[in-house]
Amino acid sequence: CLSGASPRVACGLGTVARIVGTGEPIYARKLLFEEARARIESCWRPFHEALAGLIEENLERFGYCLVLDCHSMPTPFSRLSPRPDIILGDAHGASCRPAWSNFLERQFLGQGFSVRRNDPYAGGFITRHYGRPHEAVQVMQIELARGLYMNERQYTRKPGFEAVQALSLIHI
């Protein structure tokens, strides 16, 4: 890790990440400053402007907004046993009211998935930045174990693929 920066940035997990969660580099070479800035201006900034707009639009239209920030995670976890199928991250209650966290957990458990909360993924930038439960903006990060639906070494579908694909927010 680099010194003098935030822990995430210092370790290569800033706005333009240099490594994946296992510590392996994403790029074959160090990005030039202009390349990183171009990615921020062409991808990161427009995405976040659109997300902020959608949140405000939903607040105006419905009086509340639920943001589900969905990710996939590698299956192996040395710290967790048994390995969870799903990790729900609500920034330890700071990004989402407990009622929403409890509801989502019950829905996944009811469909036969094992669930953990906030460990090791409590929520990233989207969860922490946009979650305002006191203002009716509930944000939950959902991590889904890739091993449920794919062979992680060969990148091929597993028999469980269809069951995971059938998950729908409509059913939740």
Regions of interest found by a model, annotated:
Residues 27-44:
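Surface-exposed cleft-lining segments at the edges of enzyme active sites
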